[in-house]
From Swiss-Prot:
Keyword terms of this UniProt record: Calcium, Capsid protein, Disulfide bond, Glycoprotein, Host endoplasmic reticulum, Host-virus interaction, Metal-binding, Outer capsid protein, Signal, T=13 icosahedral capsid protein, Virion
InterPro entries tied to this protein: VP7 (IPR001963), VP7_1 (IPR042207), VP7_2 (IPR042210)
Entry keyword annotation includes Signal: yes
Protein name in the entry: Outer capsid glycoprotein VP7
Coiled coil region boundaries: none
Region (LVD motif) residue spans: 237-239
Glycosylation sites recorded in the entry for this protein: 69, 145, 270
Signal peptide: 1-50
Domain of life: Viruses
Protein source organism: Rotavirus A (isolate RVA/Cow/Thailand/A44/1988/G10P8[11]) (RV-A)
Binding site for Ca(2+) 1: 95, 206, 214, 216
Keyword Lyase: no
Disulfide bond positions: 82-135, 165-249, 191-244, 196-207
Extra remark: Some rotavirus strains are neuraminidase-sensitive and require sialic acid to attach to the cell surface. Some rotavirus strains are integrin-dependent. Some rotavirus strains depend on ganglioside for their entry into the host cell. Hsp70 also seems to be involved in the entry of some strains. In group A rotaviruses, VP7 defines the G serotype.
Amino acid sequence: MYGIEYTTFLIYLISIILFNYILKSITRMMDYIIYKFLLIVTIASIVVNAQNYGINLPITGSMDASYVNATKDKPFLTSTLCLYYPTEARTEINDNEWTSTLSQLFLTKGWPTGSVYFKEYDDIATFSVDPQLYCDYNIVLMRYNSSLELDMSELANLILNEWLCNPMDITLYYYQQTDEANKWIAMGQSCTIKVCPLNTQTLGIGCQTTNARTFEEVATAEKLVITDVVDGVNHKLDVTTATCTIRNCKKLGPRENVAVIQVGGADILNITSDPTTAPQTERMMRINWKKWWQVFYTIVDYVNQIVQAMSKMSGSLNSAAFYYRV
């Protein structure tokens, strides 16, 4: 009887040892499989971390810095308003207390002291290189200049819309624009853009891909360039990258917390790139006054109506994201 019990005990003991051995073997095998899988994934991610030649990747970057949305029933009492104006306005007014005067006038329209910020920029070209719109509501004043009409139109197109952008490696790859919302946006001290359209055999159409001097020049020494080419056609690009950054961008829609007020000019600038239509936006306005005091008085008078045409947003335009965000 004792022999049977010892035998049963030994069988149980051997079963436990065998089960433990099998379990450890399975564990080691699973560890090996998992580690090998992770190694393969790591190597593959390194290898495919670049765009294949001529293939278009989804545009995922952003020019927006996110902030908490604090929309209230009475936005004028809880929001901030930024007023962007050219240096010539301050020079003409020539009064050290002029912003304080305007702040008191904005107070009569329901905007508390400290909620309105006055932001100065040198000129349209300089503002185009580094546009940063941080307030809940942003009003940009542009003095109309017939020689700068196209620059003003491009700047308005940039700041009145939201864009998603990806970097472009023009030294290795060619690119194509997929639709009307897809544009190439370049910013910098001096941007000269040349393009060479390609056929299905990746040969240049009217140009030589190995000779940038044969490319078509679409922009010369500009600070902001929004380039539009034929959709669905691959292009080789040549850009002055030492003084310019170019991105592949997709227009998402209107940036509704920004309004542009054109000072002077017969008509409001048309910012559309579609030649078949001439759409106007409520947030593109015009004031006809010669003196800047008159301009600012009008802004104060109509500030609440202007803001009503806008919407408070949770994102603010930050051009630093254009340069550094992937």
